[in-house]
Structure formats: C-alpha cells, structure tokens
Amino acid sequence: MMAFTRVRTMMLLLLSNSSTVCHAIPSPNLKIQTYITHHSGNTDEVLNVPLYRTTVTNAMMTSGPNSQSARESNSNMSCFSLGYGLSARDCEYMASIGMFDQGRNAIYNNGKMWIGRDGPNTFTFINGAGVPIILVMWYAFNKDNTSSFMNIRRPEITYSLPETGSAVEISAANGMPGGWSMIYNYSTPLSEYGQIRNTFGEFSTGDYATVDVSRLVNMAGNSVTVRVFGHQPVDTTLQPVCITDMRTCAYVCTSRSVGSCGATGSYQLVNCGGPNAVEGIDEHGNPTGGCQGWTNGGHIEVIFL
C-alpha cells in the first residue's frame, strides 16, 4: 500500500506525520437520497433540489454585490478582483476572518485543481444546508503539512454556494493530495492555528485514490456526506461504491470531552470496514483509512448538510 500524507487536522507541530491511506463501505441500512432524478437544460434536480449550472464549466456562478466597499476589508486580503464563482460578500467575509487570500479558481486544466468537469477525477459539491456556504479547497503540494492553514496559504478554490441546490464541479489531476472545508452562513471562523474551524474532507488521487471525512478540527462541525463512484463516465443513479460521512469512515476524537484533537493516540477512524473500505496503522500507531474505489479516475459527490 502506498504511503499517503493525510493533512493532520490540528496543531502545526502535529501535522508532520505521514500515513497510509485506506476506504469504506456504506451501511446496508443507510439510505442516501440525493440521486439526480431529472435533467432539464442547465438545471439538474436532486430530489427536487435544483442544481444550477453554467454551460461553460457546469458550475454555478454568483456575482454578488459589486460595490467598492464590498470589495474592500480591513484584512490584507484583496477582494478588488474576484475569482470566478466567488461573490464579493463571501470574499469580504473570508478577509474578515483572516484568510490569506481567495482561491486561484482556475477554469482550465492547470494540472492540479480547476473548476470544470473535464479532469480524470471530478468532485460535485452540493449545498443541501439551506444557508450560504463557501467551499474552500487546497492542494497539499510536496507533502506540505501547512496547506490547510488558510491564514498563511492560498487555497486553490474558494467558491460561493449561496442557497440550497447550488452546486459546482471541480476537477483534479491524478497524483493530487488535498482537502476541503466549508464556511457556513458567514459564521465559521478560523481556528487558533489558522485552519477553517469546521469539518474537513481529505483526499488523494491516483493509484491509491482515497477520500475521508475528518472531524478533528471541530467535532461539532457541520455535517457532510461523501459518495464515491467508480470510473467515469459516472451514473449517479447507481449505488456508490463507498460512502464516508460523519459516522462512516470518519476520523473522530477518541475522547468525547474534547472539541478538537490531533496528537498521536488522540483520534480514531470509525466504521471503516467492508470490501471497498481499508484501514491501516501508520508508523506512529495512528489509524489511517478512507474510501477508495476510484483509482486513477472517478467521481466524488459531496453534499453539505
């Protein structure tokens, strides 16, 4: 099994560990009711929740307020020129909590992550929460264990999902380790260490493609369900090959009395077993694992709840 660097989700000094990654199978009693059931022009419906898409990138773009004051803040981060798909209001909030910069938001194949559906690995992020959400994605280049620290690193993607049904498709090249988190309803802060204080998704593409949900930064973070589909073309009306969510193939703090964790021995991987799930132990004795089934190309559907 290939070594894979998970972005440890707490203090900087705890983010130096490498681990071997693994995968999960959905519980037979788990019913995921988010299948796309209708197609009409640029609008899909997920159980009657519309997913608005543009014809160019199959992603929703929100312009937001356009005033000069909305594009400025007291932060060093500039909102004067907005990346594709990021609203001025969302950029302004990101600046107010101390983020280093807005995302690059490439709309072409840049060899890493970009907005669009033409890559070997695609991620569809769906707002199912009913409140404005800002998607934040990062690339862990050269095993950079600080890549998720948004106070010192520029993310690859920051994208506005302003209402229920808002969706965007992101492509990733093979061989890409990275992750995502989300800002909910203009209320999610950065942690004291500079990470988004919410639930994380972590992934690596390529030969040992794996994805997991991590709750280590904030055990009380917002809920997310991640469904893994096999090689493209993908039919999301079929059952996924694997599911990771808040209770399945998820990293959680071992102690129920803490709100966050990250030290060796302080967390565990729960409910990650089955033919499409893998669990392991790294050299420090920490659990490793997550959802596989999308080697060198596949589709990941992420629903924010």
Residue ranges and their predicted role:
Residues 9-14:
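Sec-dependent N-terminal signal peptides
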Residues 122-133:
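Asparagine-centered strand-capping/turn motif at beta-strand->loop junctions
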Residues 148-182:
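Intrinsically disordered, low-complexity Pro/Gly/Ser/Thr-rich segments with frequent PxxP/GP/PP motifs
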Residues 17-21:
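C-terminal segment of classical bacterial N-terminal signal peptides
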Residues 3-8, 22-120, 149, 185-305:
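Extracellular low-complexity, O-glycosylation-prone Ser/Thr/Pro/Gly-rich "stalks"
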Residues 143-147:
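Surface-exposed binding patches on compact interaction domains or structured appendages
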Residues 138-142, 185:
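Folded extracytoplasmic luminal domains of secretory or organellar precursors
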Residues 120-122, 167:
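Intrinsic-disorder/low-complexity, polar/charged segments enriched in Ser/Thr/Lys/Arg/Asp/Glu/Gln
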